[in-house]
C-alpha cells in the first residue's frame, strides 16, 4: 500500500479530471508476471497480504489521442503471526512470507479533444494513471490475484475493494487520513 493520503488522491483526481471525462478504455493486457511460493502456509493461521501499485503512463506526443496506463504490482502474502513467532533479530516480514508475485497490467485508452482544446499535459496523464487508470485496471488485478493464488496451491485471495476518497465540503476539516492502496 502507499503513503498517499485522501487529500493527495483528491488533488490527483482534480488534475486528471479532464482526461477522465473524455477517455475510453480500448484494450487490457497482462504484460509480465513472476510468482513464487516460498513456504507452505501454516494451517492454523490465516494469511494476510500487502499489495503495492506503481502506475505509469506511456504517451506518444505525435499520436496524443491514445495513451497506455501501466500498473506494476508487487504482492506479498504472509502468514498471520503472533509476536512470539518472530525470532530475535527477525521481523515479521522476514519470517512470514508465504508467496510473492510481481506483475504488470496495461490498458490502452483513447480520447477525443474538443475543438481548440490543448493536448493533455504530462501531469494530467500521470494523475489520470494514478487515479482513474488504477480504478479501471483494479478489477482485472483482483481477478488475476484470485486466480494466481489458486494456481499456486494457496487459498484463493480476494483483494479488498479499492476505495476512492470522499471530497470534503468547502470549509470543512479533513478527517483523519490513512494510507490508501
Curated annotation (Swiss-Prot):
InterPro entries: SecB-like_sf (IPR035958). Keywords: Acetylation, Chaperone. Induction: Probably induced by the DNA damaging agent mitomycin C. Part of the Rv1954A-higB1-higA1-Rv1957 operon, as well as the higB1-higA1-Rv1957 operon, which is probably the mitomycin-induced operon; the former but not latter operon is autorepressed by HigA1. The keyword Chaperone applies. The keyword DNA damage does not apply. Disruption phenotype: Disruption results in slow growth. A triple higB1-higA1-Rv1957 disruption mutant has no visible phenotype. It comes from the Bacteria. Homotetramer, interacts with antitoxin HigA1. Belongs to the SecB-like family. This is SecB-like chaperone Rv1957.
Amino acid at each position: 500500500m502507499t503513503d498517499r493520503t485522501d487529500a493527495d488522491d483528491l488533488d490527483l483526481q482534480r488534475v486528471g479530471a479532464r482526461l477522465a471525462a473524455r477517455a475510453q478504455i480500448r484494450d487490457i493486457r497482462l504484460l509480465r508476471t513472476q510468482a513464487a511460493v516460498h513456504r507452505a502456509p501454516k494451517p492454523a493461521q490465516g494469511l494476510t497480504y500487502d499489495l503495492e501499485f506503481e502506475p505509469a503512463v506511456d504517451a506518444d506526443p505525435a499520436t496524443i489521442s491514445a495513451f497506455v496506463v501501466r500498473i506494476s504490482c508487487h504482492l506479498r502474502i504472509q502468514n498471520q503471526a503472533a509476536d512470539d513467532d518472530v525470532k530475535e533479530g527477525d521481523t515479521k516480514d522476514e519470517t512470514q512470507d508465504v508467496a510473492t508475485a510481481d506483475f504488470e497490467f496495461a490498458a490502452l485508452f483513447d480520447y477525443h479533444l474538443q475543438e481548440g482544446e490543448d493536448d493533455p499535459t504530462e501531469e494530467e496523464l500521470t494523475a489520470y494513471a494514478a487515479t482513474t487508470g488504477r480504478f479501471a485496471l483494479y478489477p482485472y488485478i483482483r481477478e488475476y490475484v484470485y486466480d494466481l493464488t489458486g494456481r499456486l496451491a494457496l487459498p484463493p485471495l480476494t483483494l479488498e475493494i479499492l476505495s476512492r476518497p470522499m471530497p470534503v465540503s468547502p470549509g470543512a476539516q479533513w478527517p483523519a487520513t490513512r494510507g490508501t492502496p
